[in-house]
C-alpha cells in the first residue's frame, strides 16, 4: 500500500513538473529555474563593468521608499499607487523594490512599465532600484530580469553634504548567495566600506530565518547566516532590508538593523511600504499603507 502511495505521489509530481502553465511554475516551485546564483553573479559583475555606478544627489538627511513582493500579473494597482506617492513626494530621493516583482510568465515588462516615469502623473523622476526575488526566477525568468531590469548584484551611491552612502543589492533569490558572491562581498566590504558614511544592504530572502519555508527558494543556510551576521557587524552595516515572507519584522542584532518589509501585493488587506530617513544619526522608519 505504501509503495502504491509513493508511486502515485511520484507520478503526480512528474505531471506537475511537465505541465505547462502561465500562472504556476510547478517545476520552479520545487526546483527554481534559471541560472544558478553563481552564474547570475558573474553575469551581473560583467554588466556592472560596462556601465557607471549610479549616484544620487541628496541632502545630508534624505528619504527613500521601500516596498516588496508586488507579485505582478496583470494587476498593477497597488504598485501604481506606491510609485505615484513616491514620485510626487518632494522629500523623497529614490525607491527600492525588494524582489518578487512578478508572478506570471512574461510580466517583467509589465513591472518595468509600472515603475517607469510618467510625465502626466509624476512630478519627479526618482529612480526605483529593483532586487531579484525567487518568483522572478520562475519560468526561466532570469533572462527577462537581466534583459529588462539589469544585474541582480550591484551597488549605488547617495552623495550628500557629508560624503557618500553606499547601497548594496545582493542576489539571494535561490536561498543562498553562493560561494562566488560571498567571496566578492567579503572583499568588496573590506576594500570599499571605509569610503562611505553609511552602508545599507538590500536583498530578497531574509537572513535570520532558517525554516526553509519555501522549499528550494526558502531561507538561507545557518552557516551562511552566521557569516553574514559577522560580516555586517564587522563592517558597520547600518541596515539590512529584506522581503520574501510577506510580514513585517524589525530586529537589531550586533548593532545592525534587520528589517523585513511586508508585501505590497494587491490581494492583501493592507499592502504596506516603508519610508526611511537617513542622516548622520542613523535611520528613522515611517510605515505606511497603500490607500
Functional labels for PLM-detected ranges:
Residues 1-10:
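Bacterial N-terminal signal peptides that target proteins for export
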Residues 17-20:
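C-terminal motif of bacterial Sec signal peptides marking the signal peptidase cleavage site
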Residues 22-109:
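N-terminal active-site segment of His-dependent metallophosphoesterases
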Residues 34-51, 107-198, 218-234, 239, ...:
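Extended active-site neighborhood of metal-dependent phosphoesterases/phosphodiesterases
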Residues 64, 95, 167, 199-200:
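Hydrophobic beta-strand anchors of alpha/beta hydrolase catalytic cores
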Residues 69, 99-100, 133-134, 204, ...:
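Active-site glycine-centered loops adjacent to acidic/histidine catalytic or metal-binding residues
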Residues 192-212:
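Short acidic, glycine-rich surface-loop motifs adjacent to enzyme active sites
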Residues 200-207, 238-248:
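Histidine-centered catalytic micro-motifs
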Amino acid at each position: 500500500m505504501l509503495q502504491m502511495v509513493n508511486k502515485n505521489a511520484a507520478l503526480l509530481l512528474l505531471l506537475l513538473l511537465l505541465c505547462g502553465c502561465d500562472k504556476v511554475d510547478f517545476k520552479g516551485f520545487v526546483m527554481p529555474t534559471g541560472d544558478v546564483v553563481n552564474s547570475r553573479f558573474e553575469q551581473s559583475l560583467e554588466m556592472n563593468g560596462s556601465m557607471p555606478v549610479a549616484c544620487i544627489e541628496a541632502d545630508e538627511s534624505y528619504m527613500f521608499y521601500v516596498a516588496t513582493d508586488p507579485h505582478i500579473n496583470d494587476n498593477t494597482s497597488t504598485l501604481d499607487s506606491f510609485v505615484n506617492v513616491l514620485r510626487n513626494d518632494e522629500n523623497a530621493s529614490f525607491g527600492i523594490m525588494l524582489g518578487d516583482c512578478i508572478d506570471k510568465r512574461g510580466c517583467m515588462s509589465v513591472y518595468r512599465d509600472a515603475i517607469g516615469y510618467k510625465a502626466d502623473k509624476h512630478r519627479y523622476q526618482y529612480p526605483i532600484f529593483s532586487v531579484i526575488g525567487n518568483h522572478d526566477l520562475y519560468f526561466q525568468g532570469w533572462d527577462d530580469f537581466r534583459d529588462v531590469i539589469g544585474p541582480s548584484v550591484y551597488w549605488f551611491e547617495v552623495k550628500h553634504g557629508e560624503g557618500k552612502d553606499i547601497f548594496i543589492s545582493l542576489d539571494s533569490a535561490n536561498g543562498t548567495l553562493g560561494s562566488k558572491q560571498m567571496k566578492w562581498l567579503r572583499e568588496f566590504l573590506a576594500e570599499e566600506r571605509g569610503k562611505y558614511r553609511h552602508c545599507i544592504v538590500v536583498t530578497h530572502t531574509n537572513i535570520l530565518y532558517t525554516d526553509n519555508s519555501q522549499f528550494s527558494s526558502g531561507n538561507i543556510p545557518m552557516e551562511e547566516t552566521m557569516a553574514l551576521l559577522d560580516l555586517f557587524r564587522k563592517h558597520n552595516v547600518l541596515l539590512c532590508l529584506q522581503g520574501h515572507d510577506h510580514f513585517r519584522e524589525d530586529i537589531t542584532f550586533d548593532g545592525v538593523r534587520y528589517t523585513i518589509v511586508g508585501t505590497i501585493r494587491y490581494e492583501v488587506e493592507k499592502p504596506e511600504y516603508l519610508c526611511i530617513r537617513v542622516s548622520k544619526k542613523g535611520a528613522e522608519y515611517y510605515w505606511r499603507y497603500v490607500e
